Regions:
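Basic-flanked hydrophobic alpha-helices used for secretion and membrane insertion
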Residues: 1-193
Length: 193
């Protein structure tokens, strides 16, 4: 069976109050990040913590019932510690996708087909919208671009980050040394490291 909760982050984005208003989003707790050690997450990602709880670096589990329960919590991302300072509602309707997390036994073929279509729709939202992004300050976004100069793709304030020796997407991170390169088609010259 599939899962309709967020299981990872898909990129970084810098949001401003005007962009939030323009997109019909809203800040439901806290504020937008201003410092380099601050992040905001979407209400869609928040739902994962509401379901599973939050576990701190020292192993202490906290129940998350309200948006503000997550504000002030720390997350370690790429060996850096960030404080969650805000939650942004990116308008993902969790109820629409609930059925894909339910047991498929006893479902009709039509129900399974509908669940499959919904899972593909949700996968697209997770990958290509702001629903699974980490919201950072403009300065932090620029810092990330400097840290990964080999490959940074910006599309409407959405950033994909990669480098010559690391492949990153929302479901896999691997060093080139971990990949069997005989099955790789190099589009811009073979990479050895």
């Amino acid at each position: 069976d599939m899962c309709h909760y967020a299981t990872d982050f898909s990129g970084y984005a810098n949001l401003t109050e005007s962009k939030i208003k323009e997109m019909g989003y809203k800040i439901v707790a806290g504020k937008l990040p201003k410092d380099n050690n601050e992040i905001a997450i979407s209400s869609y990602v928040y739902e994962t913590y509401a379901k599973a709880g939050y576990i701190s670096e020292d192993g202490i589990k906290s129940e998350i019932k309200y948006y503000n329960d997550l504000v002030g919590k720390k997350l370690k991302i790429d060996k850096k510690e960030f404080t969650i300072v805000g939650i942004v509602d990116t308008k993902v309707d969790m109820d629409r996708y609930k059925s894909i997390s339910e047991d498929s036994k006893g479902k009709t073929s039509a129900q399974n087909l509908t669940d499959f279509a919904l899972s593909q729709e949700l996968a697209h939202i997770q990958q290509y919208s702001l629903a699974c992004d980490i919201f950072v300050s403009e300065e932090m976004l620029n810092s990330i671009k400097e840290e990964y100069p080999n490959y940074v793709q910006l599309i409407n304030n959405y950033m994909y980050v990669s480098s010559d020796d690391t492949y990153i997407d929302s479901s896999r991170i691997a060093s080139l040394s971990e990949i069997d390169t005989k099955d790789v088609t190099w589009v811009d010259g073979e990479k050895t490291k």
